[in-house]
Curated annotation (Swiss-Prot):
Residues 28-87, 102-131, 206-232 are annotated as: Disordered. GO terms for molecular function: poly(ADP-ribose) glycohydrolase activity. Keywords: DNA damage, Hydrolase, Nucleus. Changing residue 555 to N: No poly(ADP-ribose) glycohydrolase activity in vitro. GO terms for biological process: ATP generation from poly-ADP-D-ribose; carbohydrate metabolic process; DNA damage response; nucleotide-sugar metabolic process; regulation of DNA repair; response to gamma radiation. Residues 106-121 have a biased composition (Basic and acidic residues). Its EC number is 3.2.1.143. The lineage of its organism: Eukaryota, Metazoa, Ecdysozoa, Nematoda, Chromadorea. This is Poly(ADP-ribose) glycohydrolase 1.
Length: 781
């Protein structure tokens, strides 16, 4: 049967002709040994009414053109092909010696990026983030629109995930590909020359790397010199404090720059955080020197540290699966051979050999093969097609095809750089630490994961919604960076939990404490910060709707830092007394808008602060923690939601959840802030005053300062500040405040400031304040 294209229009484009030639004689007609599934056609695609004009190619990467020429020459002359193959083998071995974990062995290095071809209109930091704040103010409707979709997708995904790990099925998640070091025909002399030049530049500019990155960001984004000067002061302060805290303070006091806006405001905060980390000799958990290696697994190599040797584990036949399925390996965790292994290996190798000449539909064909779609039907991928057309006009067709190939190359590294076993955070397994490159390999495999996996990118690629095109921009920017200039370091994923009795003991010891220090920031956003704990307003399923249509706070964080998606592979659905900590995630992109108006943006200085290499700890992790805590979803009218939230069991549950997350780093972080905002108050319909008070109590239990970002609601923030000041004047303790919100009573009609009004009533009566000192127990939930 001849292959037919679904809703691709007529007449046939050159790309389609190339693909027809490819599938007629090439790898696409090879049938895998396993039984193929026949899927129905996607119903959400739109028909193309006319043949889209193929964008003209641009000379974006000179080395790409030379590679094409060398491929054509080698195809005509077998002797040249043999010589190229031998040269590629030698080059591959040389690159492996210089950097064993390098992901870009077969990727050209170039200073050109996608952002060089974006609009030259300046994007100032304050303008971008002011836009984010303005949109976020009225984002509740956007949240609600995507919430219903996400909840259904999460429920379906949870059931699918249970099915995937069933004992009577083969573990399904990632197709298996093995790296082939014998035929790397897409390496050219120009790529070798470029790589050598880059190595020389890295050696000569090692002492000025971060300053150079700031200059590059300034040129690309049009950021004002004042903002860059402020970030330069932060960098200078960081380097100085590593030598001496006293010399750091003197340097800062004599280095006044005309910084403006949030850059200047946050500069002082960051200086205090640097001092706290340095003088306190603080290490974010897990401290790999002190934790039990049999529960805290380190899968990457860290200089000057011995190899990690955790105990070998086997899947429990009747419990949750602990070994992460790795379909890129020839054998599964039980030693059984995977029949699909060599089939997928041939597909990926075949694509990388001829992707430059066969076009867009070659990549579509690869995805169809990996997903095991019906070989006689090509299902349309609207989001991918729209991305291809849009980006071809901006950077050229050849560069977009190179972006696709980079994903495939990174996916090929999985078998080489990942261990044979990666354990999920279930049972007594507490944490997993992987390198940035290992994380990239896992995320790249999600591109090729079968559609029935809850961790597949298929739902993004096959959507016809514009938000999914923006998500692809985030993802391909991530893979571009990891291919051409990957950061060196590690990321830790940790499940933090506490049983009910232990928490009750903690509460008894801490309920007599005074309220914590609370600072308010009207313009600063959570993602503007560094050297702190950033709160992720999470779904109980980590990542929420990031792999679907979700585009609110948690999804945006995961798009800015795609390696956070590895946590989705490692973590089960969060339980009531659990939180998930991610330490060291690198930021790859910025954004504008919120919800359905979300847009990708090149990385801005305010978001790149936490990427500073000087902020890395001795394990190579960036000193920033993202703590994921999920709130309760309330439904109904505003009055119904407010009444339900004032139920004592719900107050106790939310207080425990926030406290466990805020206590994740232990007792030594008393000067390191928790940066948060209106947690659970968007699509989850949380009462903002109540959620603010609950987080104040949780920060007090953790004995850490609270930095509260009001997201453009200064009036509400002013009321929060006023109520905190009044309570401090009355010497209100954590236990007294907890008692107040547990005895507010129920409102007769919805009033936004009902909780504050009731607290003010208590504060007006000293008798009520004294009587509330006998705080209730929190053990009822």
């Amino acid at each position: 049967m001849s292959k037919k294209f679904i809703e691709l229009g007529d007449p046939v484009t050159q790309d389609e002709k190339d693909y027809e030639d490819y599938v007629g004689v090439g790898f696409a007609h090879q049938v895998p040994t396993m039984k193929r599934r026949k899927l129905t056609e996607h119903g959400n695609t739109t028909e193309s009414k006319e043949d889209p004009e193929e964008p003209k190619s641009r000379d974006v990467f000179v080395s790409s053109q030379s590679s094409d020429e060398s491929q054509e020459d080698s195809a005509e002359n077998p002797e040249i092909a043999k010589e190229v193959s031998e040269n590629c083998e030698n080059l591959t071995e040389t690159l492996k010696i210089s950097n064993i974990e390098s992901l870009d062995n077969v990727t050209e290095r170039s200073e050109h990026t996608l952002d060089n071809h974006k609009s030259t209109e300046p994007m100032e930091e304050d303008v971008n983030n002011k836009s984010n704040i303005d949109v976020a103010i009225n984002s509740d409707e956007d949240d609600e629109l995507v919430l219903e979709e996400n909840n259904k997708e999460m429920r379906d995904g949870e059931q699918v995930q249970q099915d995937l790990f069933a004992d009577d099925q083969e573990l399904i998640e990632y197709p298996g590909i093995m790296k082939d070091t014998t035929t790397q025909l897409d390496i050219t002399d120009s790529e070798v020359e470029t790589a050598q030049k880059m190595e020389m530049i890295e050696e000569t500019e090692a002492d000025s790397t971060f300053v150079g990155e700031d200059s590059k960001n300034q040129r690309q984004s049009g950021t004002t010199s004042d903002e860059v000067d402020a970030d330069s002061q932060i960098n200078l302060a960081t380097k100085t404090v590593r030598t001496s805290s006293s010399s750091f303070l003197s340097t800062v006091s004599t280095c006044e720059a005309p910084a403006k806006g949030r850059a200047r405001m946050y500069q002082k905060e960051l200086e205090k955080h640097v001092i706290a980390f340095t003088e306190g000799n603080l290490t974010l958990q897990p401290d790999l020197n002190k934790v039990d290696p049999d529960r805290n697994y380190r899968y990457c190599t860290i200089p000057n540290f011995p190899a990690s040797q955790g105990k070998l584990r086997e899947d429990n036949r009747y419990g949750p699966k602990i070994v992460l399925p790795q379909r890129w390996r020839e054998f599964d965790s039980r030693g059984r051979r995977r029949d699909s292994y060599f089939y997928f290996k041939r597909k990926l190798d075949g694509y990388l050999k001829c992707y430059k000449t066969t076009g867009y539909f070659m990549f579509v064909g690869l995805l169809h093969n990996m997903w095991e779609f019906d070989p006689d039907i090509t299902y349309k991928l609207p989001a991918l097609e729209m991305y291809y057309k849009e980006m071809s006009e901006l950077v050229g067709r050849e560069e977009v095809l190179e972006k696709f190939a980079r994903v495939a190359r990174i996916a090929k590294t999985a078998e080489d750089i990942l261990p044979e076993r990666i354990y999920r955070l279930v049972g007594d397994v507490e944490s997993a630490t992987l390198s940035h490159k290992q994380c990239a390999a896992l995320v790249a495999r999600m591109f090729f994961a079968r559609p029935d996996s809850p961790f597949s990118f298929c739902r993004i690629l096959s959507s016809d919604k514009s938000i999914c095109v923006e998500k692809l921009k985030f993802l391909f920017t991530y893979f571009d960076k990891m291919s051409m200039d990957p950061p060196d370091g590690a990321v830790s994923f940790r499940l933090t939990k506490m049983d009910k009795d232990t928490f009750n003991e903690e509460w008894k010891d801490k309920k007599l404490r005074s309220l914590p220090e609370v600072e308010f920031f009207d313009e600063m956003l959570i993602e503007d910060t560094a050297l702190c704990t950033q709160v992720d307003f999470a779904n109980e399923h980590l990542g929420g709707g990031v792999l679907n249509h979700g585009s609110v706070q948690e999804e945006i964080r995961f798009l800015m830092c795609p390696e956070m998606m590895v946590g989705m592979l490692l973590c089960e659905k969060m339980k009531q007394l659990e939180a998930i900590s991610i330490v060291g995630a690198y930021v790859f992109s910025s954004y504008t808008g919120y919800g359905h108006t979300l847009k990708w943006a090149e990385l801005q200085p305010n978001h790149s602060r936490q990427n500073t290499n000087e902020f890395r700890d001795r394990f190579g992790r960036l000193r920033v923690e993202t703590i994921a805590i999920d709130a309760i979803l309330f439904k109904g009218s505003k009055l119904d939601c407010q009444t339900e939230q004032l139920n004592k069991a719900n107050i106790i549950r939310e207080m425990k959840k926030a406290s466990i997350g805020f206590m994740s780093q232990g007792p030594k972080f008393t000067n390191i802030p928790i940066v948060t905002g209106w947690w659970g108050c968007g699509a989850f319909n949380g009462d903002k005053p109540l959620k603010f008070i609950i987080q104040v109590i949780a920060a007090g239990v953790a004995d850490r300062p609270l930095h509260f970002c009001s997201f453009g609601e200064p009036e509400l923030a002013a009321k929060c500040k006023k109520i905190i000041e009044r309570m401090k004047q009355k010497d209100v303790t954590l236990g007294m405040l907890f008692s107040m919100i547990n005895n507010t009573g129920l409102p007769h009609k919805h009033f936004e400031f009902y909780v504050f009004d009731r607290i003010s009533t208590y504060l007006s009566s000293s008798e009520d304040v004294e009587s509330s000192k006998s705080s209730p127990s929190v053990s009822r939930a």
